[in-house]
Amino acid sequence: MDEDKDIDSKESGEYEDDFEKDLEWLINDKEKSNGSTIEMACKKEDDLDQVLKENETETELGQQLSDPDNSPKDEALPRRNDFISVPSIQPLDPISDSDSENSFQDSKPENQKDLEDEEDEEVRRYIMEKIIEANKLLQTQEPVNDKRERKLKFKDKLVDLEVPPLEDSDTCKALLENETNMSGKLSQLCISGDLEQESVLVSVTDGSCEENDRKILVERDGKFELMNLQDIESQGFLPPISSANSVEHESSQLPLRAPNPSVGGIKKEESEAKGHVLPISPAGEPLAQVPQLLPNPKNRPSSAANPDVTKKARRSNHRIQSAGVSPVTSTYCLSPRQKELQKQLERKREKLKREEEQRKLEEENEKKKENEMVFKAWLQKKREQVIEMRRVQRAKQIEDMSSRQVNRDPQQAFRLWLKKKHEEQMKERKTEELRKQEECLFFLRGTEGRERAFRQWLRRKQIEKIAEQQAVKERARQLRLEARRSKQLQSSLYSIPEAKAFRFTDHYN
């Protein structure tokens, strides 16, 4: 808990430092803006000071040149300021070095004091002017708007969650003491290494008690039962346990007992998962107090570290993955009845699978049959439509032919025939002209041209022959059609019987 408090305090401290840094940044920006104006003012002051110093040095040099007695001062000033190099003028009266040094030292402090006083006055004057200007600016500025939304906002309560310290320190101490007592008593036990079959804790009583009277509390399937030690040993869960005095002598001589074959693997797994035994005295009272959970454990935040969970995770990482997980298909721990049930379930699954496949095949066959029936119906419908269209076209052709025979104009037919003849003659003329042009080119080209012209002539002859045959066929077809039409007309004219033509009918009776 102390570590959690330290972590929370560190996080809150870092959170407060961030806000302090933001405030310092805002303050520094304001100081920089004010400092820039002050730097400009200082630069102006330095420039004025340099100008004043130059003017003073020039006036002093002019006075020294006019007065020959002040020659040592003239030599000292150019060395100190290095503004103007003036040649040294030898005085008329010889003066010793000690006198010149004394006079220079006397004049130096006076000049420095005068310069410092003037600089102080200039600085004061400049500062006063700046103060007056700043006051004027502040008076002219608009008041600050407090309702303006600020970018940097602060919460009333900076820390959202505070973890209270544990108040049950006394209960924790009691739990630790109980654990140490239990570990001390368990260390007195001497049980053989075959403890993986069932997790049983046995309390060793004093040697005065008889072995037959000792009882142990065993948990099975959520129920607690008092059992004798001999019954547990006979079932093979534990090796025989002697008294505390004879354990040290006989522990090396005890043979390891094999588990009872009547106990199946399922019982072992259940005993490993659920078997918890408490040490009981012969009177039936527990020897040691078992640690219990807190009555009202407080809810801790999820960020708090849980050392038990981390330790378990570390331990589990070192184990092999297959050690804790048994294969699903393994049947080594099943009883014969369970194996039979498993086989029945597998048979049911296979049967359902076969039925599902059969049902799918039947559905596919039904769909195929339906598709074939639909296709046949569509094909029959299309055939009927084609037959109907042909019948209608034939009827129209017969009507057109009959109308042409009835309303036939010989002059119009002659004009059509004359037009066709004219078109045929024009085509023949064009072909004749092309042939003549090819023959002219034939005499100019040589042997290659002759062969090509011969091949073209043969092709043209074949085309003409085919055209004549088609014309003969067309003429014969037209003759057959005319003969058929004439027969139809004759049959329609002579179909009325003669008796009906000369019969008298009285329409008034």
UniProtKB/Swiss-Prot annotation:
Keyword Kinase in annotation: no
GO CC, alphabetical: cytoplasm; manchette; microtubule; sperm flagellum
Biased composition (Polar residues): 60-69, 319-333
Compartmental location: Cytoplasm, Cytoskeleton; Cell projection, Cilium, Flagellum
Residue ranges of the region described as Disordered: 1-122, 237-369
Tissue and organ expression note: Predominantly expressed in testis. Expressed at lower level in brain, eye, trachea and lung. Barely expressed in tongue, heart, liver, kidney, spleen and muscle. Present at high level in elongating spermatids, whereas lower levels are observed in round spermatids (at protein level).
Organism superkingdom: Eukaryota
Keywords of this entry: Cell projection, Cilium, Coiled coil, Cytoplasm, Cytoskeleton, Flagellum, Microtubule
Main location (coarse class): cytoplasm
An MF annotation (GO) of this entry: microtubule binding
Keyword Nucleotide-binding part of the UniProt annotation: no
Feature: compositional bias, Basic and acidic residues: 22-33, 41-56, 70-82, 266-275, 337-369
Residue stretches in coiled coil: 335-377, 418-488
Described purpose of this protein according to its UniProt entry: Microtubule-binding protein that localizes to the microtubular manchette of elongating spermatids.
Known partners and oligomeric status: Homodimer. Interacts with HOOK1. Interacts with HOOK2. Interacts with HOOK3.
Entry similarity comment: Belongs to the CCDC181 family.
Record protein name field: Coiled-coil domain-containing protein 181
Native species: Mus musculus (Mouse)
Gene: Ccdc181
